[in-house]
Structures are given as structure tokens and as C-alpha cells.
Amino acid sequence: MGQTLFDKVWNKHVLTGNEGEPQLLYIDLHLIHEVTSPQAFEGLRLQNRKLRRPDLTFATLDHNVPTIDIFNIKDEIANKQITTLQKNAKEFGVQLFDMGSVEQGIVHMVGPETGLTQPGKTIVCGDSHTATHGAFGAIAFGIGTSEVEHVFATQTLWQTKPKNLKIDVTGQLPKGVYAKDIILYLISQYGVDFGTGYAIEFTGETIRSLSMEARMTICNMAIEAGAKYGLMQPDEMTFAYVKDRKYARNFDRSINDWRQLYTDADAKFDKVIKLDVTNLEPQVTWGTNPEMGVSFNTPFPKIKNINDERAYQYMGLKPGQKAEDIDLGYVFLGSCTNARLSDLVEASRIVKGKQVHPKITAIVVPGSRSVKKEAEALGLDKIFKDAGFQWREPGCSMCLGMNPDQVPEGIHCASTSNRNFEGRQGKGARTHLVSPAMAAAAAIEGRFVDVRKVVV
């Protein structure tokens, strides 16, 4: 019987262990940041251990980084975490993309941009959205702090192999509908746990037609479907993206092997989901997890359980309302889901020559210094600033309430991030997940509108 893409990469990295039991995997790349690494480094010190493979360990600063004055960190905990990573990186010989570095940015942007993320690798990071790197045909997954320490010490992890789930996406995306809408729709239809226990391979003509940046958006949110892993078959678009990047020095030696990374025709999946996106609409979340979402023209659903009741109460909304009824106050363009150059380009087309609605606070946070530089070379910063957006420095920013960028209590925010949990963007913040185009249009109109009627 043939193998799936996931099986091929997994089996190549098994050092010991039987099928159906925990197996010891070799880890090719370990990405770290300031939040989940301090205790792991301290664990090495307490046991008088060295970092096993500093050459396979790369660090960046992202979660706590201010996006206005990056060298003036007022929060004591944030400042301590940042200075601790700087100290640890120096002590243990880890390459750190430090504050102000041309390569600094959100960890799941830095990996691909530098060429560290490559097909066929096993990649881990102490962050939930590590599956982003699966868009390159890698097995990439988030780990906890104790596992971070285990990788530090051994460059391995014990893992139990998951089942295989194929999501076959076909049809041409309508104008004004994007990769973000695909993954939001899937989660709204099948729930936040339909991928639990599975590695999801996204396949089909629609996936193959997407840019690498759009593919990363989909894999980024696999965890929101309950899946630890999300991946896609690497192809010529993947190889072109990786080629000539700083850490892709092995490109010529590796590309033939990368071309073998595909699911065999006779491979069997444990579950298959099919989605035709021909008539897909822009998506908007109304509640407090990504499953609580609707197509733009669909009324919010009836209350089915206590979770729905609590979500409506927290969000200040009612069944039967529509996205256009939401009283927005903030718009956030950023995060590891949608802060890449193509995201900012698409949003800039919508806001060019227009003005942010007077009641809206609109913020653009490029996901990395590289994206910021490229965007400014294209004049995107001027387009956004002329329209009334704030143009910030790179970082995780308003995706999570761990830095100064937070949504005020009770305020609704159109956000291009990946999570809309209670308090995710600040105490009492009300988050609505949308595509960059939807967020940009909302900033101008002061409310959600059907972006299909707005896109250039």
C-alpha cells in the first residue's frame, strides 16, 4: 500500500519505536521565542546540560515586542522574557534574530523567509501555530515548554503517529474570497475538533493554485480545527519560494528528494472531506471560538447550547443579526496568519485613496522586518498612513494580549488573526476573524461590508 505525504516524512524521522506506540522522532529544526523558552534553558542549566544542536536552533523575538517604540519595553515581565532570551541565546550559541535585526519578526514568518523552513523537515516550536510551516511539505507542530527542553537536550521528541485526514479543495475562488475564508468556512462547518487526532493534508486544484503565502494561512489555522499537523504537497511553487533564501544552501542537493514528497496514488486516508469553493462567500466569526462563524450574508445562528449563550453574551450580539450589524471600533491587520506582503498588498488596494472611518482605530503590523521593508519599498506604508491607518513595527501585536497592543474592553475588532477567544486581544475585547480584504473594507466603511463588491 502507498504512503501519504505525512507518512513519508514521519517514517524517515523515526529513530525507534513501534507503529501505534510513541516513537522517537529526530527534529530537523527548532524555532524558539521569548515566551516558551526561558524555563527550558533553565532546565538545561539545572542539569548541567549543553544544547545538543545549536546549529538547528533559531530564535526570534515576537510575542512581547512593542510595535511603536521597540526599544522601550515598559512591562517588567515582557522585558525580562526578552532580555532572558538575549542572554540565553548568547550563552548557548543560538542564532537570535534580535530587536531591530533585518530578519526579526513573528517566528512563523521568519522560518519561511530565511529559508530555514524546507520540504520534508520536522519542525517544532513552542507555539500553537507551528503547523504554518506544513505548507512547505514539512511536519511542523507546536510543543510545550517541557518538550522544548527535551529538544534542547536531545534534538528528539517522543510522539504518537496520528491518523491521516485529507481535505480535497476544488473550484475557483470567487473574487473577494481568499484562503482565510477557506479555513474559516471549514472550521465553521466541521467544528474546532474535527481534526483532533489527525494530520490534515490539504489537497486539490484550489490548493495548488494558491500562492505560498496563502497556503501558509490555511496551514496556520489547522490547530483551530483541532489538528496538531497541517501540510501540503510541495511543488514547483514551493521550490521557487525556497530557492536562493539565506539558509537554503542545500537547495540543489535536496530538490530531487523534495520532488518525491507526495501522497502515493494508492495511499489510504482515514477520513476524507471534500469542499467546492466555487460559491464560497467571505467569512466572519461572531462568537468566541473560530467555529462560531458564518458566511457574510448569513444571519447569526440560534442558541443551541450554553456555549452559544455565553458567546452571545460576551460578544454583545444576538441570534438573527448579521455581520453588517456589528458595531466595530478597531481593525487589526497583522499576525502570523495574515501579515505577509500579499496580505498587505490586497488590503492596500481597498484603502488606497480612501479614509478610515472616524470611529475606527486601524492598525497595520507587518509580520516581519523583511515584510515591512518590502512593503515600504512598494509604498504601501504611505497608502495606509494616508488613509488613516497606523503603520507599526513587526511583532505578534494585537493577535494576543501579551504586549501593549490591545483592544479596549467591550470593543469589537475586525482582525486578521487566528483566535477569537474571550480576552484574546485584551480583557473584554470582542474579536471577529476575517480576511485582510474584509478587515480593510471594514476600516473604511466603519462596519463589515461584502468585500466582493469592493475589491479592485
Curated annotation (Swiss-Prot):
Secretion signal, residue range per the UniProt entry: none
InterPro entries attached to this UniProt entry: 3-IsopropMal_deHydase_lsu, Acnase/IPM_dHydase_lsu_aba_1/3, Acoase/IPM_deHydtase_lsu_aba, Aconitase_4Fe-4S_BS, Aconitase_4Fe-4S_dom, IPM_dehydratase_rel_enz, IPMI_cat
Organism: Staphylococcus haemolyticus (strain JCSC1435)
Record EC number: 4.2.1.33
Protein name per the record: 3-isopropylmalate dehydratase large subunit
Assembly and interaction partners: Heterodimer of LeuC and LeuD.
CDD domains on file: IPMI
Keyword Thylakoid in record: no
One of the record's GO molecular function terms: 3-isopropylmalate dehydratase activity
UniProt xrefs under Pfam families: Aconitase
Enzyme class of the recorded protein, top EC level: lyase
Cofactor: [4Fe-4S] cluster
Cofactor binding remark: Binds 1 [4Fe-4S] cluster per subunit.
GO BP annotations, alphabetical order: L-leucine biosynthetic process
Family: Belongs to the aconitase/IPM isomerase family. LeuC type 1 subfamily.
Metal-binding in keyword set: yes
Catalytic activity of the protein: (2R,3S)-3-isopropylmalate = (2S)-2-isopropylmalate
List of residues binding [4Fe-4S] cluster: 336, 396, 399
Keywords: 4Fe-4S, Amino-acid biosynthesis, Branched-chain amino acid biosynthesis, Iron, Iron-sulfur, Leucine biosynthesis, Lyase, Metal-binding
